[in-house]
Curated annotation (Swiss-Prot):
One of its GO terms (cellular component) is mitochondrial inner membrane. This is Uncharacterized protein C23H3.12c. Keywords: Membrane, Transmembrane, Transmembrane helix. It is found in: Membrane. It is a single-pass membrane protein. One of its GO terms (biological process) is mitochondrial potassium ion transmembrane transport. Its main location: membrane. The chain crosses the membrane at residues 121-141. To yeast YDL183c.
Length: 226
């Protein structure tokens, strides 16, 4: 498993986790279901239906508003596929030299402690689901509140799994910090408006967009504090 750490405003750290090649090959039933949902969502995105386009637009806004901490925990959740021996062989954290290891560890500890928060959110999602039943009785309008609560319940459940796995990873005490000058150079180019090197270095199509959203979220927090 590989974790990329990049600096954010307010002394925070953006953590991006994605599995090793070995972990990626272990396809589960859950993975197959999620892939089908993605394909279904893509078909709605391509549809010319006004209702479907509105639902997709609303859904995308919700996705973009998801806290970056939650995205990290949801990404780390599949680590449960690994046993302890495999975990020892696959985990490391790559970061630019100007980002201190202590700051990264503090962010990891902060993320690990979000389990209770997401548990409370999950309970709220489940309690709210019965309230959306009346929408089912309206045949021309999809039960968007129900779909939303189901989606948020799933997200919070995955975040809980992620926090549990993160605690497990940190208890093993085999987190290896690796400074990367290439990452530092790519980050400098990114701040100057060129995101291509950073995208190419990470090799994940959504990485730069997620990092931009994380920066924007912390900047909004700064404005609120001021």
């Amino acid at each position: 498993m590989r974790i990329i750490a990049l600096p954010l405003p307010n002394q925070r750290v953006f953590l991006h986790c994605y599995p090793s090649e070995y972990l990626a090959k272990k396809v589960t039933i859950h993975d197959k279901i999620i892939n089908r949902i993605y394909k279904y969502w893509d078909s709605w995105s391509a549809s010319k239906s006004y209702t479907k386009q509105k639902v997709v637009s609303l859904g995308n806004r919700i996705l973009h508003a998801t806290p970056y901490e939650e995205n990290f925990l949801r990404a780390i959740a599949p680590v449960k596929k690994l046993n302890d021996t495999e975990l020892h062989q696959t985990l490391y954290i790559e970061h630019p030299p100007n980002l201190e290891s202590s700051t990264i560890l503090a962010e990891l500890n902060r993320s690990k402690q979000l389990q209770k928060t997401h548990t409370n959110y999950l309970i709220g999602n489940i309690i709210g689901l019965p309230l959306t039943i009346p929408f089912i009785l309206i045949p021309l309008i999809p039960n968007i509140p129900g779909f939303y609560l189901c989606y948020r319940a799933y997200c919070n459940f995955r975040a809980i799994q992620g926090s549990i796995q993160l605690a497990r990873v940190m208890s093993i005490e085999n987190i290896q910090m690796q400074e990367s000058e290439k990452l530092e150079k790519a980050l400098k180019l990114f701040t100057n408006g060129d995101a291509t090197p950073l995208n190419a270095l990470i090799g994940h199509p959504d990485f730069v967009d997620r990092y931009k959203r994380a920066v924007a979220q912390e900047q909004r927090k700064s404005k609120i504090i001021k």
